[in-house]
């Protein structure tokens, strides 16, 4: 699963939201939270927070490091 996420983010240099990653991989987004956290600790990916005030949403954009 980590390799699939890495390949997916390589094709999206501006990053993707958690739900977008889940849609591409066809998995439930809650199952990705631990995997993304592990990848962040390993230094493979990083996330930046984003606010959408118009829709009242707060989310993280995940992207490859380096």
Task: Give residue ranges: language-model regions.
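Short amphipathic alpha-helical interaction segments
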Residues: 27-38
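Short helix-capping/hinge SLiMs at alpha-helix to coil transitions
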Residues: 10-13
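Pre-recognition alpha-helix immediately N-terminal to the DNA-recognition helix
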Residues: 3-8
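A local structural micro-motif
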Residues: 30, 47-48
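Short, cationic-aromatic polyanion-contact patches
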Residues: 1, 17, 48-66
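Glycine-centered, phosphate/nucleic-acid-interacting loop/turn motifs that mediate DNA/RNA or nucleotide
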Residues: 43
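A short acidic, leucine-rich amphipathic alpha-helix
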Residues: 20-23
């Amino acid at each position: 699963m980590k390799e699939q996420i890495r390949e997916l983010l390589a094709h999206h240099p501006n990053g993707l939201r958690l739900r977008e990653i889940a849609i591409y991989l066809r998995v439930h987004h809650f199952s990705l939270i631990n995997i993304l956290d592990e990848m962040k600790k390993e230094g493979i990916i990083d996330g930046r927070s984003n606010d959408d005030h118009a829709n009242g949403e707060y989310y993280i954009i995940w992207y490859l490091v380096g």
